[in-house]
Amino acid sequence: AILASSGKKVLTNPTGSNFTRGVAASIVAGSTWSGKLDYDIAIIELDEAYAAKFVELVRPRASLILNVMRDQMDRFGEIDHTAQLLEAVVHATTDVVILNKDDKRVNALQSSTQAEVLFFGVSSKLRDVFRSDDELHGEIINADEYAIVELRSMSDEVITLYIDGKTYRYPLSLYGVYNAQNATAVTAMCFALGLHPKDIGRHISTVTPAFGRGERIYVGSKRVILQLVKNPGGFRHALLGGKSIDAHHVMIAINDDYADGRDVSWLWDVDFSSLAQSSIITTGVRAADMALRLQYDEIETLEYERDLKTALKTSLLLTPDDGTLLLYTTYTAMLKLRTLLSEITEVEKI
């Protein structure tokens, strides 16, 4: 969105479908009838496993590696294997690699490339918020590398970044603390691509949530917030962001399809204590598993209901007019929930 606002014609895969089929669909949709791609640049979000295959065919000029988290362990086996897949991406990159200095597995990838390496990160006072996977239940270790862009402070509406020796304040209209880190990473990439920090800030303030990532949908006067969750770190950040929302009801939708990850044991690595006083329904294929996980944190649910449509209907009834319903949901459940919501209200088409 930032590059598009700066005048670039950008090809991307906006639906969140980051397997081969999603990228291929975006390329086909963006092509002319003769197969030409009339764009200045392609910004592609890729699943780790498919990224390693993709770069065998198309070597990226630039790559951005945010973090390595336990995600879909049924596919990847263990987190160090995920890091090896990302190493292939870094090795294939020709011009510049942007790495998170605060994630030790990402940091270590700097030795795997001949391209220029730049780092982004957060200040030491924010490290407790943005813990790496090893630090979720362990000691925080600060890296020595210089960050070309560093997140110094954040609020619900403004982030302060230290960019190449100067301080900038950017308005941010994106829900969730994780978006402050995302904005930091994106700023580093845009800066590496030649955009001026003031231009980045002007454009980043206009970025709206990607669908399902803090997306707001209104059902009458009721506000529904869709928040995608898929690993311990992401769910932790989503819950931290949820503290600033006066949600009247919470629904947690957990599926275990291939795109979600069959193994949902990662739920046991999330601290759900912030939901202790919430009105909660769990739903999806793993509704009972989610309810059991909450019970171990001594959090009672109103009910667990596998059927998404029934659970959504009940949750909307439990949300008062002018109130907020907060939905934490895995990927395939999120797609279904957006479809269900589109049957009763206006939902942006992707």
Regions found by a protein language model. Give the residues of each.
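Phosphate-binding loop of NTP-binding sites
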Residues: 1-116
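Buried hydrophobic packing segments
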Residues: 3, 23-27, 183-193, 238
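Short, acidic/turn-prone active-site loops that include or flank metal/cofactor-
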Residues: 15-18, 67-71, 122-125, 255, ...
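Short glycine-/acidic-enriched loop or helix-start segments at secondary-structure transitions
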Residues: 22, 53-54, 74-75, 107-110, ...
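Structural beta-sheet core signal
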Residues: 44, 63-65, 99, 119, ...
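Glycine-rich nucleotide phosphate-binding loop and flanking beta-alpha elements
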Residues: 49-50, 70-72, 104-105, 126, ...
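ATP-dependent carboxylate-amine ligase
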Residues: 188-198, 202-350
